[in-house]
Amino acid sequence: MSTPGKAVLRVRNLHKEYAAAGQTTVALNGIDLAIEPESFVSIIGPSGCGKSTLLQIMAGLASPSSGDVLFGTIRVQDPPRDVVYVFQQYTRSLFPWKTVERNVAFGLENKGTIPREEIVARTREMIGLVKLTGFERHYPWQLSGGMQQRVAIARALACRPAVLLMDEPFSAVDALTRAGLQELLRSLWHKLGLTVVFVTHDVDEGVYLSDRVVVLTRAPGTIAIDIPIEFPNPRDQIATRALPAYLDYRARLLAQLFSDEGLKTGEAA
C-alpha cells in the first residue's frame, strides 16, 4: 500500500452516484487509493463495479458525487496535462483521416508550445518504441487492431505523461496480439519510468503486468483487497505464469471475485 506522502495520484473517500428514472444508483462507495510514482497498478472487478468510472474520475473526465482526486497537491477537476488516458475502443480514439505520424503528433501539436523540430523527433521516437517504423504514412484503417492500439499508446506517450491511465486497452484483440502488447507495455513502463493505472477484467493480465492489484466489489464498488505482486523482472509469458507464486496470486484474486459473486470453485454456471 502506498503512503499519502509518496502518491502521485490520490483518491480520497470517493463516492459516485447516478440519478435516472427517479432512482439513485451508487456506483462507487468510499474509494481510497494512492498511486506511487513509477508503479503499475491494475484494477479488476466484476462488470458494472465502477472500474471505468473510477478511471474516468481519476482522469478528470467525470466528476465524483463526493470525495476528490489529487494529482500531486492539485485537486483534479479537469483533465490534468500530465495525465493521459488510453481508451478501450482504439478505433474511436484515433483520427481515421490522419496518418499514423499525424495521429501520434496530435497531442504535441495541440499543446501549441513545442517547437516543430521537437514534435518531429518525439513522434519518430515513439513510433519506433512501439515498433511501427515504416508505417508512418499508413492510416488507421490500413492497420490491424493491435497496430492501431500501438498508435494510441504512442500518441499518449509522446506527451511524456506523469501518469498513464488505461481502460481495458487490450480487450478487443486476439490472445497472441494481447501478449505482444503486454510485453510492449511492460517494456515501455520500465524504459520510460511510467506510472500506470490499468483497468482489466482479466485476472491473469492483472497479475502478469502489475506490481499491485486492486479488486473492486460488485456495485456499489468498494475496495475488497489491495495486494502487491512480487515477481522478479523481466517477466516471461510462459515462465512467469508457471511460477507457484503466480498461481497463488491468481487463486487469491479469483477467490475474492467468486466470493463477491456468491460462487464456489467448480460451481456450475
For the regions a language model picked out, list residue spans one by one.
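Helix-to-loop junction immediately C-terminal to a conserved catalytic motif
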Residues: 59
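Conserved ABC transporter NBD signature motif
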Residues: 67-79
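Short helical segment in ABC ATPase nucleotide-binding domains corresponding to the A-loop/adjacent helical element
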Residues: 101-109, 120, 124, 228
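Conserved ABC ATPase "signature" region
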Residues: 116-135, 187
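Conserved ABC ATPase signature
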Residues: 139-143, 147
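A short, proline-enriched helix->beta-strand linker immediately N-terminal to the Walker B motif
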Residues: 158-162
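Catalytic Walker B motif of ABC-type/P-loop ATPase nucleotide-binding domains
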Residues: 164-167
